[in-house]
């Protein structure tokens, strides 16, 4: 009887999974068409290893763009960490959970039933790669000081590489309040991995991680090289 129930549950979930796959493919195609995002891999490569990607945050579309530029095999195992309050409602929650497989975090302490670091740590224990935004909110210029979550993940999972990711131009491609994209090149640059050093203090690590993210920003030569490489391909 138990086997029959499990089989029935799997059958009932099949249409939902199929819809999520179709919608995920459609979103990927749409994001590439609208924003033409390009991935630059500097100091690392798109490898099938568990990682924590940590990125700057200037737009609501940031994690979708990073998700879109990852190779399909890496995309399937990468879980973005996102604010639960933004992904409320039936459709948004379906997209977040079923399409992006996001780890949804409550930003307001009084509404939390789970510790955010514990939620992320469980996902890592389950084999997921995470995409997080350590600033904790969108910045309109520069990079805000990092919250402590990245440090706690580095301490709990010292063997997992932490890869800085710089998202460039997305806030200008689709300015706040606009619905028509501006034709600018959007790049996603992946930098050299870092780890928590032995005995490294929290503040020192967070400063070093922030500096690593800033150092990942692409130069004009990097973008020109990516354009030439794509044209040659």
Question: Language-model segments: which ranges?
Answer:
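Catalytic core of membrane glycerolipid acyltransferases/transacylases, capturing the structured
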Residues: 47-108
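Compositionally biased, charge-rich terminal segments
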Residues: 1-19, 84
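Helix-to-loop junction immediately C-terminal to a conserved catalytic motif
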Residues: 19-20, 24-57
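A charged, well-structured terminal subsegment
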Residues: 117-118, 122, 189-214, 220
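Residue-level preference for the first positions of well-ordered beta-strands
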Residues: 50-52, 129-133, 163
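Internal catalytic-core helix/loop-beta-alpha segment
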Residues: 102-143
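Short, flexible loop/turn segments with low-complexity composition
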Residues: 219-233
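A cross-family acyltransferase "interaction/gating" segment
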Residues: 94, 129, 140-203
């Amino acid at each position: 009887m138990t086997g029959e129930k499990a089989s029935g549950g799997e059958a009932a979930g099949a249409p939902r999974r199929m819809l999520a796959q179709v919608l995920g493919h459609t979103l990927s195609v749409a994001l590439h068409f609208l924003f033409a995002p390009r991935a630059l891999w500097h100091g690392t490569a798109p490898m099938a290893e568990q990682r924590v990607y940590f990125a700057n945050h200037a737009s609501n579309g940031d994690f979708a763009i990073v998700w879109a530029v990852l190779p399909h095999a890496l995309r399937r195992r990468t879980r973005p960490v996102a604010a639960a309050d933004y992904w409320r409602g039936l459709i948004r929650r379906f997209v977040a959970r079923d399409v992006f497989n996001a780890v949804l975090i409550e930003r307001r302490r009084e509404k939390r039933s789970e510790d955010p670091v514990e939620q992320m740590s469980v996902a890592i224990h389950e084999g997921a790669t995470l995409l997080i935004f350590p600033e904790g909110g969108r910045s309109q210029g520069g990079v805000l000081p990092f919250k402590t979550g990245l440090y706690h993940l580095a301490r709990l999972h010292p063997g997992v590489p932490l890869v800085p990711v710089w998202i460039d131009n997305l806030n200008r491609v689709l300015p706040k309040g606009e619905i028509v994209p501006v034709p600018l090149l959007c790049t996603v640059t992946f930098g050299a991995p870092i780890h928590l050093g032995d005995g490294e203090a929290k503040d020192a690590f967070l400063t070093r991680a922030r500096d690593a993210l800033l150092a990942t920003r692409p130069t004009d030569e990097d973008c020109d090289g990516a354009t030439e490489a794509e044209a040659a391909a």
